[in-house]
Amino acid sequence: MREQHVLLLCLFVSYASITKSRYFDEGDECKLEHKGNYSKFPEDFSFGVSTAAYQVEGAWNEDGKGPSNWDTYTHLHPERIDDHSNGDEAAESYHRFDQDLVALKELKVNFYRFSISWPRVLPFADTRVQNQKAIDHYNMMIDKLLENNIEPMVTMFHHDMPEELTKFGGFTNDIVIKYFHYYADFLFKTFGDRVKKWITFNEPFVYCIPAYGNAVFPPMIHAPGVADYLCMDNTLKAHASAYRLYKAKYSNYQKGKVGMAISSRFYYTNTTDFGSEDIVDRAMQYSFGWFAHPIYGESGNYPFTVIEDITSNSMKEGLAWSRLRPLSLYWSKIVKGSGDFLGLNYYSSHFARMAEPPEGEIPSWEHDSRLKLLVDKTWKRAKSDWLYCVPQGLEDILKWIRDKYNNIEVYITENGWSDEGKLDDTDRIDYLKSHLQAVLNAINDGCKVTYYSYWSLIDNFEWNRGYTERFGLYYLNVTSENKERVAKNSASYYRSVIESRKLS
């Protein structure tokens, strides 16, 4: 994933010295105490790792692949990438999957979450041209994983859209719903006999606002509070359309599960004043709930607070309709319940308070939400300036999901720590251990968490940060001819947890 979070949040996150919070002790230690009766993960709990196609595959113009939005963006705007790099070669996983497989086997993971490149398999976005070489490649990957008792978990869209679709406005045009429907049908038909876990979209909240609101990701549209909301609306409908397709056409004989990966922090207040819990709930609904509430909530629509605020603000701005229209009865029926599991990408947390007056452009998500987000300067920070070690947040967001969404089954689809790429990565081990402890605590408290995926298997291209921030359990020698993968100390630690099913 990863660097994307900062692009949304850097505009309105402040630092604060919150040294006497009722939630956290002072100090920067990255740890969490064990709670509950069980000290081991259940036998049916699955451990894995994640990657994404554009970030690791390389081979950007080989074997019939079409251009993606990220190919075009990095080639036309190298100055927007911190080290002027791109994903043209990346880890060369398209040609070096055997090296990735060696790492997966060393880790003894139960599953591998990877994404299929839409422009690689369908260069023109629809099914008129199907790239057989790409199909053969992904068939090879899936078959080799299964031969080694590693379950494939496939993400359909991890931010690399066929460039062809940007001509129509990308996710601002509802035609993308139909295109994604065809793409999903193709994937289910081609790979669904072996792939039983599907993630339609990865972190739509995180790509919609930077790409269509703040103009810092392709296609660099600056229309906050309008185009980014269209993106999120069309993504939600595309997801639900694909889900209903699977249930109607494939589910009975393929027996798979379909869900979405939603990113979120957990939010806290540093006060016990009346109304503080409302602020926490508001922050959660304006981020996580934007997608989770329509799918897993009772209403089958966006959170009421979000609908009410944006409608009111739109009227104040002189508009005849809301910038975020509630889902129609037709779409509400399709969207509600369109998830067999909930994918959660969690990295860090924030403190939240109401911003008076509201901040941000008019219109914008920042202005509509009226939230001011803060971090505690005593928290341990990663290489990424948005990433702090707050394991309690993972435990608490899992409990929040349990209570809000009828204890839906949760797959933790991403969770990770960045540094400069050092092999002796003690901080990553601390982060990993404390967050796995949070998962175990949540399981002990009745949360239905069944999968955990660390981000990432190997160091990779981190979007606008290039290769300046590394999340991998394996170091990637980007400049070498063979793109060697070298195990960091954290890889050994993670393997020990997987083998023993307990935290050491």
Question: What do these predicted ranges mean?
Answer:
Residues M1-E3, M140:
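Ordered, helix-dominated protein-protein interaction surfaces in large eukaryotic regulatory proteins
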Residues E3-S21:
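Cleavable N-terminal signal peptides of Sec/SRP-targeted secreted and luminal proteins
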Residues I18-I81, K105-E106, F124-D126, Q132-S504:
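Active-site region of glycoside hydrolase catalytic domains
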Residues D44-S46, Y94, F111:
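A common structural microfeature
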Residues S50-A52, S115-P119:
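Acidic/polar N-terminal loop/beta-strand segments that form early-domain functional surfaces
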Residues D82-R96:
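Active-site mouth loops of central-metabolism enzymes
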Residues N110-S117, E151-T155:
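Short, well-structured secondary-structure segments
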